[in-house]
């Protein structure tokens, strides 16, 4: 059985490589090329976070019932180069929006689909597996369609803000 510490330990070498990089389009492309589906890191960490959701230690706090859950797995610390690690589970066939939020320092978001065709909206379109890397100061609704996904996100300094007003639609 895997544990949160297994996922944290697997993330340390990855975060060592990323500690001086900034979220955005260039990093998103690089993450998908170097660490996307099929890479050793992606497959290992995706397996661990899937185990965590199944076993109840990841994405286990309901935000909007059982279809939208999250949990912080690690606080920012020196060992993680001051990134936090959070898991989010979202499940909806029809497009579904979660809590509007802002990324003061950006976000590195590993998208793990649990159903074929499940996708998460990223800043550059829908992502069915791989990475999104919203820029610093970006803000959005997390949005899923096509089934269940896990979003495992790494936040510089653990910074995320839910204290922001969504734009008028």
Swiss-Prot record:
Keyword tags: Lyase
What EC identifiers does the entry list? 4.3.3.-
Q: Which domain of life is it from?
A: Bacteria
Give one GO molecular function term.
lyase activity
Q: Note the Pfam families from the entry.
A: PnbB
Query: How is this protein's function tied to pH?
Result: Optimum pH is 7.0.
Annotated catalysed reactions:
4-hydroxylaminobenzoate + H2O + H(+) = 3,4-dihydroxybenzoate + NH4(+)
Temperature behavior, per UniProt?
Optimum temperature is 30 degrees Celsius.
State the InterPro entries in the record: PnbB
| Biological role | Lyase involved in the degradation of nitroaromatic compounds. Catalyzes the conversion of 4-hydroxylaminobenzoate to 3,4-dihydroxybenzoate (protocatechuate).
Record-stated family: Belongs to the PnbB family.
Protein name per the record? 4-hydroxylaminobenzoate lyase
């Amino acid at each position: 059985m895997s544990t949160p510490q297994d996922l944290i330990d697997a993330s340390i070498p990855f975060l060592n490589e990323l500690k001086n990089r900034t979220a955005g389009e260039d990093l998103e492309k690089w993450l998908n090329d170097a660490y996307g589906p099929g890479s050793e890191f992606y497959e290992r960490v995706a397996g661990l976070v899937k185990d965590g959701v199944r076993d109840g230690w990841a994405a286990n706090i309901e935000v909007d019932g059982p279809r939208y859950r999250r949990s912080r797995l690690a606080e920012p610390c020196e060992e993680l180069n001051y990134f936090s690690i959070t898991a989010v589970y979202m499940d909806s066939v029809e497009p579904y929006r979660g809590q509007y939020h802002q990324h003061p320092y950006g976000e590195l978001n590993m998208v793990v689909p649990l159903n074929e065709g499940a996708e998460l909206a990223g800043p550059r379109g829908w992502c069915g597996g791989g990475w999104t890397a919203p820029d610093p100061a970006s803000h959005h609704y997390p949005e899923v369609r096509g089934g269940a996904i896990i979003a495992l996100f790494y936040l510089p300094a653990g910074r995320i803000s839910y204290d922001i007003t969504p734009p008028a639609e």
